[in-house]
Swiss-Prot record:
GO annotation terms (biological process): menaquinone biosynthetic process; methylation
Protein name per UniProt: Demethylmenaquinone methyltransferase
UniProt keyword annotation of S-adenosyl-L-methionine present: yes
Native source organism of the sequence: Corynebacterium efficiens (strain DSM 44549 / YS-314 / AJ 12310 / JCM 11189 / NBRC 100395)
Top EC class, one word: transferase
Gene: menG
Amino acid sequence: MAKASLDKDPFDVASMFDDVGDKYDLTNTVLSFGQDRVWRRRTRERLDLKPGEKVLDLAAGTAVSTVELAKSGAWCVACDFSQGMLAAGKHRNVPMVVGDGMTLPFADNSFDAVTISYGLRNIHDFRAGLREMARVTKPGGRLTVAEFSTPVIPVFGTLYKEYLMRLLPKVARVVSSNPEAYIYLAESIRAWPDQEDLAREINANGWSDCGWQNLTFGIVAMHSAIKPGN
């Protein structure tokens, strides 16, 4: 995959993630300077999960995010379209399901909450993915999307772009089994909607009352919304 865009081939993306599963968690921690752990905790806190609730963790990868969500006492299932990623996390004691974000293998109104972290960019048609997530969520259920976004401080934003396009690929070549995956990451982040535009897309595709919270100066934005209904 020579150049990333928001028009991506699902097979290419799945194959790319299959190749990075073994070192994925370590690579993310190194490249984010440890912030990935903070972002996972903040996602759990934002969802305000209750014991016994059913939660879908979509694009869960190795399920490290699912384990964090399960600390709430909720029943959480990890779903990802990369079998290699799920296999790399098979030692984690959480339910796992292989599934495509555009055709989820779950019945209507199955979950109290759905979350997707750093995976919405990778769904072939992310708008259809948002609608599919709404389909499997109960009326009144919650959505949280954690995604790389647009830094809110201009000077910091300039430094961040330099890091994405210059330093990140170099570090990835040292710590990742497939550095091309992180070149894709950098390019797809640059093509992604900013916070306001993504909130508009979420509200237009099955959800309502979308707002967001910036993390680490807007490197990550956490969008939250509700499925309309009782």
